[in-house]
Amino acid sequence: MKLCDFEVGLDQPLFLIAGPCVIESMQLQLDVAGKLKEITGKLGINFIFKSSFDKANRTSGTSFRGPGLEEGLKVLDAVKKQIGVPVLTDVHEYTPMNEVAAVVDVLQTPAFLVRQTDFIKNVCAAGKPVNIKKGQFLAPWDMKPVVDKAKSTGNEQIMVCERGASFGYNNLVSDMRSLSVMRDTGCPVVFDATHSVQLPGGQGSSSGGQREFVPVLARAAVAVGISGLFAETHPDPSKALSDGPNAWPLDRMEELLETLMELDAVTKKHGFARFA
């Protein structure tokens, strides 16, 4: 599949979607995007910057949600033009899709909205590549009907993203079998290594996370075989305004990505045959 100006798939090297969870300021986004461009350029990784203008599903109603649509699009447009990288953001049911699609290169649907038929179709009808996150409550094989809805709009640029499955209260687990199962949708599969270590609502008024397991799950996913990796990162996760507990430190991204690219090359060298 053609994504931005590069090809993605199991016959292509791993690509990266990364950036801060939420747009905190113009300068932070430019700094992080610039550093990620430097790292990915050095390692030969195709890179898409991500950040959200509105986090509509925060645990607490008083938590920081972002700058909003107008200011958020200005920031994303600045990142795209000044840093020279494609950009991704997530959209919601109330989002003016065409307005967002005029700025960003890739649209993303939140996991909690994966079963909302009209929403999925409206996003995909905007004509941009779409990264559809699998709901924490959804079986991997149930992504096939979601993809069918998406492609019924005529948009063939659809990706599916694994971000963990609910496992009791305030906990997620990653079933690596789902990465193989979701290949049957015919779409590139992306693994979200940071939201997969989230502890939803685990801190009462906010979500917790187990950042130390990001490289564990990322390595496992790459070893199974994926097209892309999604990872939220921040210069100081302890001060991040959203999802800090599961964000990977920016100054440790290069070492993580270097390892993952080596694993990716080995995995894809040996193919993905199914065994009955």
UniProtKB/Swiss-Prot annotation:
Query: Can you state which reaction this protein catalyses?
Result: D-arabinose 5-phosphate + phosphoenolpyruvate + H2O = 3-deoxy-alpha-D-manno-2-octulosonate-8-phosphate + phosphate
Q: What keywords is this UniProt entry annotated with?
A: Cytoplasm, Lipopolysaccharide biosynthesis, Transferase
Q: In which pathway does it act?
A: Carbohydrate biosynthesis; 3-deoxy-D-manno-octulosonate biosynthesis; 3-deoxy-D-manno-octulosonate from D-ribulose 5-phosphate: step 2/3; Bacterial outer membrane biogenesis; lipopolysaccharide biosynthesis
Main localisation: cytoplasm
Compartment annotation: Cytoplasm
Choose any GO biological process term that the UniProt entry carries and state it: keto-3-deoxy-D-manno-octulosonic acid biosynthetic process
State the NCBIfam families in the record.
KDO8P_synth, PRK05198.1
HAMAP family in the cross-refs: KDO8P_synth
Protein name listed in UniProt = 2-dehydro-3-deoxyphosphooctonate aldolase
Which species does this protein come from? Answer: Xanthomonas campestris pv. campestris (strain ATCC 33913 / DSM 3586 / NCPPB 528 / LMG 568 / P 25)
